[in-house]
Amino acid sequence: MFPMVTEFMNYGQQTIRAARYIGQGFMITLSHANRLPVTIQYPYEKLITSERFRGRIHFEFDKCIACEVCVRVCPIDLPVVDWKLETDIRKKRLLNYSIDFGICIFCGNCVEYCPTNCLSMTEEYELSTYNRHELNYNQIALGRLPVSIIDDYTIRTISSSPQIKNG
């Protein structure tokens, strides 16, 4: 009869322990109930990117001297620089410049080491397409300035919504 009493006491202790664990989990759940949602409705709401966000690369054709520093510092030798040597003035003339964003890792080395600052990172991050060949941008596509998220009146930015507080 004595082992039956100890089993009943163990069963009671296990029941109390299980109820305590369930109560702790429920308290954590309730502590999150008064917080605002963290998710955003993407096509209609967008995050404002940070100041040093590394998005699509902007290229200024007139500033480029075809030195190919961007190609040398790129870990995957990505930028394609076509140039022609002008023999009368002994300088390179840039013919074509392109970057394939399907391969680019957005490390920012090309922007950082460019001696003429003809490359810069933009806040544009919507580069998805159905055809991977559309991600190969030439100097005309790279020269296009992106529309700022803040200036787009059709989109509500996250900074205009209530602040998310960490509980």
Swiss-Prot record:
<dbReference type="InterPro" id="IPR004497">
    <property type="entry name" value="NDHI"/>
</dbReference>
<comment type="function">
    <text>NDH shuttles electrons from NAD(P)H:plastoquinone, via FMN and iron-sulfur (Fe-S) centers, to quinones in the photosynthetic chain and possibly in a chloroplast respiratory chain. The immediate electron acceptor for the enzyme in this species is believed to be plastoquinone. Couples the redox reaction to proton translocation, and thus conserves the redox energy in a proton gradient.</text>
</comment>
<keyword id="KW-0411">Iron-sulfur</keyword>
<dbReference type="InterPro" id="IPR010226">
    <property type="entry name" value="NADH_quinone_OxRdtase_chainI"/>
</dbReference>
<feature type="binding site">
    <location>
        <position position="110"/>
    </location>
    <ligand>
        <name>[4Fe-4S] cluster 2</name>
    </ligand>
</feature>
<keyword id="KW-0874">Quinone</keyword>
<feature type="domain" description="4Fe-4S ferredoxin-type 1">
    <location>
        <begin position="55"/>
        <end position="84"/>
    </location>
</feature>
<dbReference type="Pfam" id="PF00037">
    <property type="entry name" value="Fer4"/>
</dbReference>
<dbReference type="GO" id="GO:0008137">
    <property type="term" value="F:NADH dehydrogenase (ubiquinone) activity"/>
</dbReference>
<keyword id="KW-0677">Repeat</keyword>
<keyword id="KW-0793">Thylakoid</keyword>
<feature type="binding site">
    <location>
        <position position="67"/>
    </location>
    <ligand>
        <name>[4Fe-4S] cluster 1</name>
    </ligand>
</feature>
<comment type="similarity">
    <text>Belongs to the complex I 23 kDa subunit family.</text>
</comment>
<dbReference type="GO" id="GO:0051539">
    <property type="term" value="F:4 iron, 4 sulfur cluster binding"/>
</dbReference>
<dbReference type="InterPro" id="IPR017900">
    <property type="entry name" value="4Fe4S_Fe_S_CS"/>
</dbReference>
<protein>
    <recommendedName>
        <fullName>NAD(P)H-quinone oxidoreductase subunit I, chloroplastic</fullName>
        <ecNumber>7.1.1.-</ecNumber>
    </recommendedName>
</protein>
<keyword id="KW-0520">NAD</keyword>
<keyword id="KW-0150">Chloroplast</keyword>
<feature type="binding site">
    <location>
        <position position="74"/>
    </location>
    <ligand>
        <name>[4Fe-4S] cluster 2</name>
    </ligand>
</feature>
<dbReference type="GO" id="GO:0048038">
    <property type="term" value="F:quinone binding"/>
</dbReference>
<dbReference type="GO" id="GO:0009535">
    <property type="term" value="C:chloroplast thylakoid membrane"/>
</dbReference>
<feature type="domain" description="4Fe-4S ferredoxin-type 2">
    <location>
        <begin position="95"/>
        <end position="124"/>
    </location>
</feature>
<keyword id="KW-0479">Metal-binding</keyword>
<feature type="binding site">
    <location>
        <position position="114"/>
    </location>
    <ligand>
        <name>[4Fe-4S] cluster 1</name>
    </ligand>
</feature>
<keyword id="KW-1278">Translocase</keyword>
<keyword id="KW-0004">4Fe-4S</keyword>
<keyword id="KW-0618">Plastoquinone</keyword>
<keyword id="KW-0408">Iron</keyword>
<keyword id="KW-0472">Membrane</keyword>
<feature type="binding site">
    <location>
        <position position="70"/>
    </location>
    <ligand>
        <name>[4Fe-4S] cluster 1</name>
    </ligand>
</feature>
<feature type="binding site">
    <location>
        <position position="104"/>
    </location>
    <ligand>
        <name>[4Fe-4S] cluster 2</name>
    </ligand>
</feature>
<feature type="binding site">
    <location>
        <position position="107"/>
    </location>
    <ligand>
        <name>[4Fe-4S] cluster 2</name>
    </ligand>
</feature>
<keyword id="KW-0934">Plastid</keyword>
<dbReference type="InterPro" id="IPR017896">
    <property type="entry name" value="4Fe4S_Fe-S-bd"/>
</dbReference>
<dbReference type="GO" id="GO:0005506">
    <property type="term" value="F:iron ion binding"/>
</dbReference>
<comment type="subunit">
    <text>NDH is composed of at least 16 different subunits, 5 of which are encoded in the nucleus.</text>
</comment>
<dbReference type="GO" id="GO:0019684">
    <property type="term" value="P:photosynthesis, light reaction"/>
</dbReference>
<keyword id="KW-0521">NADP</keyword>
<feature type="binding site">
    <location>
        <position position="64"/>
    </location>
    <ligand>
        <name>[4Fe-4S] cluster 1</name>
    </ligand>
</feature>
